[in-house]
Design a protein with these regions (language model features):
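Structural motif
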Residues: 80-81
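Mixed-charge (Asp/Glu-Lys/Arg
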Residues: 2-77, 86-88, 92-201
């Protein structure tokens, strides 16, 4: 299972950014998406592998290295987790429902999507997650797999927001608690004390 930070709002055109965020996070069906919509029309694209190969060839011809986000989508499987943000800076946790698929929207520059189950988390997340969005030249995506605590936190947060246990969360000696936001620490304390649960932000 992979946990990845993905930026959805890289375009400088505010209308495009807003349209992309609305398409990905505000609809009944939610997605994480990447661009390269310009390659559509060059040849038939049946699946993500076709899309990937065409983009890779196009980038190579233009003397560019392939963007790592393309490989991330190629490797995505059901139950992989993504962290993203909306235009208000709110964090979202998203679970992949399956593999990446080609989807063309030239106006929003969408070339491929991963259908997801996504939930608003709020403004407070561990520093390792928030920091990954603020890195200079951080790119479209960053893998968060190396930090075991972040993987477990991400699974915990998805379960919490979904209201069901999709993931088994491993018990960690203090590590998981160190990564909880103050709101989630309070919620956890309330659950264990029998007090009413606070409303989610």
């Amino acid at each position: 299972m992979h946990v990845t930070r993905i930026n959805l709002k890289t375009d400088k055109d505010m209308k495009k950014r807003e349209g992309l965020i609305n398409f990905c996070l505000k609809g009944e069906i939610k997605y994480v998406a990447i661009g390269w919509s310009h390659i559509y029309g060059t040849r038939e694209i049946k699946d993500y592998r076709d899309y990937y190969d065409i983009v890779k060839g196009s980038e190579k011809r233009n003397g560019k290295r392939i963007n790592s986000a393309l490989n991330t989508f190629l490797d995505t499987k059901a139950d992989d987790l993504f962290w993203t943000r909306d235009l208000d800076g709110m964090y979202w946790i998203c679970r992949a429902k399956g593999e990446a698929i080609p989807k063309c929207d030239k106006e929003l520059d969408i070339g491929a999507v991963v259908p997801v189950e996504g939930y608003l988390v709020g403004l407070e997340v561990p520093g390792q997650i928030s920091g990954s969005f603020n890195r200079v030249n951080g790119g479209i995506k960053q893998s968060l797999d190396k930090e075991k605590e972040i993987v477990e936190y991400s699974k915990y947060m998805f379960n919490s927001r979904a209201g069901r246990n999709v993931y088994e969360v491993k018990k960690m000696e203090g590590g998981l608690l160190n990564n909880l936001s103050s709101f989630d620490l309070e919620e956890l304390a309330r659950k264990n004390s029998g007090l009413p649960i606070a409303e989610k932000p």
